[in-house]
Amino acid sequence: MSSSSNRQVILVIASQAYVVYTLLSLISLGLVGDTPTFYIFGDSGVDVGNNLYINTIAKPVFPNGIDFGKPFGTPSGRYSNGRISVDFIAQELGLKNFPAPYLAPTTVGDVLLNGVNYASSGSGILNSTGNFLGRVISLENQIRYFNRTRQDIISNIGIRDAKKLLAGAIYIVATGGNDVGSSIPQRNSSSDGLASLDLRFDTILSALRSELIKLYELGARKFVVVNSPPFGCAPFVRDVLSKRDGCVSLENQMSQMYNRKLKSMLEELTKNLTGSQYVNADSYAMQEDIIQNYIQYGFQDVNNACCYVVGAHGGIVPCVTISQVCWDRTSYVFWDPFHLTETAHGIVAKHMLDGDSKYMQPMNIRKLSTT
């Protein structure tokens, strides 16, 4: 074979190798293929460990994480016995690792390309929410952290690929429950009752709207915004306001009032922000479905916290080191005074991934990931 032919063969092999290398690199960055990248914002419902790195009393100490799979006695950073909804979603869609907590020292470099979790237990939409707990990371500060992530990604892979990665990613925003819950004193002190919260909820949602637009301006396009769960069904609310089995209707009406306003706002954002899709994840409907049909889902207890200290429903004290823990965690809906068990989280995740318009409007996460 002539030297000219040898050079041609070498060039062909080199070009093919380069194409394969480039394709593999793009797949690993989430720029090619079916596995989306997730950036997650919110409160204790989706926190996976950020609060372990800050000065706050809102830390999910053991027995939180008792079934997570780490060495016994090691906190998982989650307010549950095991995995939470965002973990199930990540696994189902093929992510090799859960999106890492932003404040973990190992969340740097290529880890940022596979998704990051900025959520902080006790936080809310308003900067003042959760301040009594010590330091919490408000939604505004979570998005500031995301902006730093964005700059690091641009430095790592260049602005063109960064824009593509960020536009194709899914942004889960699961916050507002603590803002709704902290509205109870205002409602109780007003002769107008629920009507007195109209302006407060407008203020909360105006702040949320501003933060969602910031994310859009930073390159986000696919949003999943989780609404307020049925607050009146939590063991804490039952113990403090009712003492009886069954949900507290007035607290649930608060959540419903907030959720109606949120849904309208998300529809307006999708209409007015070019190329955006704001999905309303109806956490209220998902948890209501579990509570109303708990026997069909295989649960035995829908009223009490599995991890408990005191209270008719175990709802007075958070899950802490002195707590008692139920033996069969799969039979309980509620893990602690506010949060769900791993089994219940798995059902919520299934609704978010594949649920119809009763739970996800206008589409579920699986469909959003392919648009």
Go through the PLM ranges and name each one.
Residues 2-371:
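Conserved active-site regions of diverse hydrolases
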